[in-house]
Amino acid sequence: MTKKKAHKPGSATIALNKRARHEYFIEEEFEAGLALQGWEVKSLRAGKANISDSYVLLRDGEAYLFGANFTPMAVASTHVVCDPTRTRKLLLNQRELDSLYGRVNREGYTVVALSLYWKNAWCKVKIGVAKGKKQHDKRSDLKEREWQLDKARIMKNAGR
């Protein structure tokens, strides 16, 4: 029996979309693969990705990541045209695609990218079916977060 490889030090997360959790209620999450070009993989290994403005388009029975920015490396090949904001195809199975189509078309949800990470040697994107928050929802979340920080600070100082 072979030994399992030791986990590499460092985080597997490439990019997070913190704004999505602030602006949307995330109802359901899916893991999807990405169809990438060689220079994009090289950029991701260097951690040069931004998904803060990205969302998922559902068209012709397929899902596409739109608005993600992968900054090309300076040492990437010169004979390939590098488009940092190109639309990338998401690799999902048919059941997941049908679920996304149903939620988006019927119930008025949207699909946003939540995080970009490595799973073994493959780059994966976590997408979420989301519904927009109102302004008062955002304010109540902010108050709750501040209260949690204050509570932790009080408990820390109470032990002294």
From Swiss-Prot:
It is found in: Cytoplasm. One of its GO terms (molecular function) is RNA binding. Keywords: Cytoplasm, RNA-binding. PROSITE patterns: SSRP (PS01317). InterPro entries: SmpB, SsrA-bd_prot, SsrA-bd_prot_CS. It comes from the Bacteria. Belongs to the SmpB family. This is SsrA-binding protein.
